[in-house]
């Protein structure tokens, strides 16, 4: 069968892709990728993903989101409400262009968010963007490092129905709470080196799994730039862990992605 893979979480607007994005996307097409869901981490990337979607219509699909960690110079800081408020009108303005709200979520890694105040601010920003997703009737593309339980509980409390938890690394019991809520989980090529993640992949039903690269990060070799064409590594690893064919993983995860990101069908 012809390959039809969907990368549900990649960072095409990252500086690492500035010089050769055309070749990167050509290699993705040659690898059988049929659609790319391009997330953002900050407002400076919004225009980039919109332009990429216009240059590659029907192939690159943009998302808008404010990541829980924000750059300030060469450092990262835990997101604050004032990082989000000035740009909220952009979500409405581009509601017809974007396919999801993301990358949003929570990151309680101690060296970034070690105070209750920082964590509370992250939760406020997360909730506000979840509310935007409900207003726009869009799914969410979610980051949940060291915060899996709170992330899933917050989404459930707000009645979120359509969500992708990318590069999920929480406990299997927490993942199953997300499965019961109807959420999806995606895994990048880097998980092929992680036995703990294999246990998680075994437990999550294939009907709740999508593929991602998180490129340019989270490739098999952390010293080499990852790119969307490597998504087959994720596909083959999930197949190996579950003891099924990569064709089945490809078919089911693509259907899952089309269900979750309904605008990919149009």
Indicate where each model-derived feature is located:
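Mid-domain alpha/beta scaffold segments of enzyme catalytic cores
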Residues: 1-266
